[in-house]
Swiss-Prot record:
It comes from Helicobacter pylori (strain P12). This is UDP-N-acetylglucosamine 1-carboxyvinyltransferase. GO terms for cellular component: cytoplasm. The lineage of its organism: Bacteria, Pseudomonadati, Campylobacterota, Epsilonproteobacteria, Campylobacterales. The gene is murA. Keywords: Cell cycle, Cell division, Cell shape, Cell wall biogenesis/degradation, Cytoplasm, Peptidoglycan synthesis, Pyruvate, Transferase. Phosphoenolpyruvate binds at K22, N23. The keyword Transferase applies.
Amino acid sequence: MDFLEIVGQVPLKGGVEISGAKNSALPILAATLLSQQEVKIKSLPQVVDIKAMALLLQNLGAELEWLDPNTLQIGAKSLHHTEATYDLVRKMRASILVLGPLLARFKECLVSLPGGCAIGARPVDLHLKAMQQLGAEIKIEQGYIHAKASKGLKGNDILFDKISVTGTENALMAASLAKGITRIINAAKEPEIAQLCTFLQSGGVEIEGVGSSELKIRGVENDALNLKDIQIIPDRIEAGTYLCVGAITNSQLKIHRIIPNHLQAITDKLIEIGFSLDIQENSIEIYPAKKRQAFEITTKEYPGFPTDMQAQFMALATQCLGTSVIEETLFENRFMHASELQRLGANISLKTNVATISGSTELTGSDVMATDLRASSALILAALVAKGVSRVHRIYHLDRGYERLEDKINALGAKVLRLKEK
């Protein structure tokens, strides 16, 4: 198992290129199961979750060829398997995304209940209810979802009681081969969903309302789609994380390959804190702030402040003047990084889903442990400004979603080493 050793308080300067969005790539990889022609997916990030999904597709019978480190060609014309086994699915929750496409194309599938990150309840009930609304029979037996629609799926209204990103994605993929019209009401509005819509539209699926909370889908009444090649959009959470690298170290950094309007909740908050940003069509440059003011954040669904940036801003709050307040409304157990930040000297108090952070705190290097993907990046941010050396353990969480993070930060001047645990 690896850990990162980080020397704190090293000056940073330069630029970072953002990788493709993991959270866009995963549903698009799953959607290739709907296609009878080969598809090339470009700008895939080389992270553990992508490799796990690729392995799952291969296990289902898809033919995979890596054309370069970030381009994958997938042929799913002759799949021979419609069972997503526990051994593969347990590695990440996003594996549930194969449910919709397998059911739509083959009218029956067996998918293990998923595993993945430990940040609270992420029930699959919303996914199952959506499949039932399209006419599927669902049974859960011995840890497996058995879904069946002998006569194929039929378009219908799907109302989500609670906004669900992966639930919306599964419903979209299933509806793309359903007969007639499906309306998804209270759909998630993330950019990653908009890109999935673009991908499905390339195969002839008619989708109205892209980017809104109500999607109208007219399915293609064939056995499969003919999807076209696609390039994954830049990762807005990775971009936000590197903006926070600049913010917490009060450095001048330029973030390349971004889509500015995907980052507005993050950039608005950084400007409120006191940073100057030069926002261009494909890049953002952050400049040191004369004074960094405390702030308040409430996490919300897109286009609100992303829950996936909450941990990074908690680390940043330790260096701001005054007391900051962060309210987490989307997930339970998502403050597990707080106790690890406290090991570095952070002054944080928690009350249910609200964290209060006292700023202007001098952090000191220590051994800390990552508890989930975004918590790991928050600990690295804090270590960059801590006095002395920090070691961040259990970084397999980090490797699930950040491509070559230590290489990218070291290119800015940081001193970060990946080492093996003894």
